[in-house]
Protein backbone atom coordinates (compact mmCIF):
# COMPACT_ATOMS: atom_id res chain seq x y z
CA UNK A 1 0.00 0.00 0.00
CA UNK A 2 1.39 3.38 -0.99
CA UNK A 3 1.92 5.62 2.00
CA UNK A 4 3.42 9.10 2.03
CA UNK A 5 3.93 11.16 5.15
CA UNK A 6 3.75 14.92 4.87
CA UNK A 7 7.11 16.32 5.90
CA UNK A 8 7.30 19.45 8.00
CA UNK A 9 7.02 22.56 5.84
CA UNK A 10 6.37 20.51 2.69
CA UNK A 11 3.64 21.78 0.36
CA UNK A 12 0.71 19.43 -0.14
CA UNK A 13 1.28 19.43 -3.92
CA UNK A 14 4.75 17.91 -3.46
CA UNK A 15 3.41 15.18 -1.18
CA UNK A 16 0.63 14.46 -3.66
CA UNK A 17 3.18 14.19 -6.48
CA UNK A 18 5.26 11.74 -4.41
CA UNK A 19 2.12 9.71 -3.65
CA UNK A 20 1.14 9.50 -7.34
CA UNK A 21 4.66 8.39 -8.27
CA UNK A 22 4.64 5.71 -5.56
CA UNK A 23 1.23 4.43 -6.72
CA UNK A 24 2.53 4.15 -10.30
CA UNK A 25 5.67 2.33 -9.18
CA UNK A 26 3.66 -0.22 -7.21
CA UNK A 27 1.22 -0.79 -10.13
CA UNK A 28 -1.76 -0.26 -7.82
CA UNK A 29 -3.94 1.29 -10.53
CA UNK A 30 -3.30 -1.60 -12.93
CA UNK A 31 -4.16 -4.11 -10.20
CA UNK A 32 -7.42 -2.33 -9.32
CA UNK A 33 -8.47 -2.24 -12.97
CA UNK A 34 -7.63 -5.92 -13.36
CA UNK A 35 -9.82 -6.86 -10.38
CA UNK A 36 -12.68 -4.50 -11.24
CA UNK A 37 -14.57 -7.21 -13.16
CA UNK A 38 -14.40 -10.96 -13.64
CA UNK A 39 -12.83 -12.39 -16.79
CA UNK A 40 -13.63 -15.94 -17.74
CA UNK A 41 -10.54 -18.10 -18.32
CA UNK A 42 -11.16 -18.15 -22.09
CA UNK A 43 -11.42 -14.36 -22.18
CA UNK A 44 -8.21 -14.06 -20.16
CA UNK A 45 -6.47 -16.28 -22.69
CA UNK A 46 -7.76 -14.22 -25.63
CA UNK A 47 -6.65 -10.97 -24.01
CA UNK A 48 -3.23 -12.44 -23.25
CA UNK A 49 -2.84 -13.67 -26.84
CA UNK A 50 -3.92 -10.30 -28.23
CA UNK A 51 -1.31 -8.54 -26.09
CA UNK A 52 1.34 -11.00 -27.28
CA UNK A 53 0.41 -10.34 -30.93
CA UNK A 54 0.57 -6.59 -30.34
CA UNK A 55 3.96 -6.94 -28.64
CA UNK A 56 5.31 -9.09 -31.49
CA UNK A 57 4.10 -6.61 -34.14
CA UNK A 58 5.78 -3.78 -32.26
CA UNK A 59 9.03 -5.76 -31.98
CA UNK A 60 8.94 -6.61 -35.71
CA UNK A 61 8.36 -2.96 -36.59
CA UNK A 62 11.34 -1.91 -34.46
CA UNK A 63 13.59 -4.49 -36.13
CA UNK A 64 12.67 -3.18 -39.60
CA UNK A 65 13.92 0.32 -38.78
UniProtKB/Swiss-Prot annotation:
Molecular function, one GO term: structural constituent of ribosome
Keyword Ribonucleoprotein included in the entry's annotation: yes
GO cellular component, one term: ribosome
Keyword Glycoprotein attached: no
Swiss-Prot/TrEMBL keywords: Ribonucleoprotein, Ribosomal protein
Gene Ontology biological-process entries: translation
Pfam families according to UniProt: Ribosomal_S21
InterPro entries from the UniProt entry: Ribosomal_bS21, Ribosomal_bS21_sf
Family recorded in the similarity comment: Belongs to the bacterial ribosomal protein bS21 family.
Database matches in NCBIfam families: S21p
Protein name, per record: Small ribosomal subunit protein bS21
Organism: Acidobacterium capsulatum (strain ATCC 51196 / DSM 11244 / BCRC 80197 / JCM 7670 / NBRC 15755 / NCIMB 13165 / 161)
Gene: rpsU
Amino acid sequence: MAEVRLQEGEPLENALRRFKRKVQQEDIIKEVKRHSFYLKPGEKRRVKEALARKRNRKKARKEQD
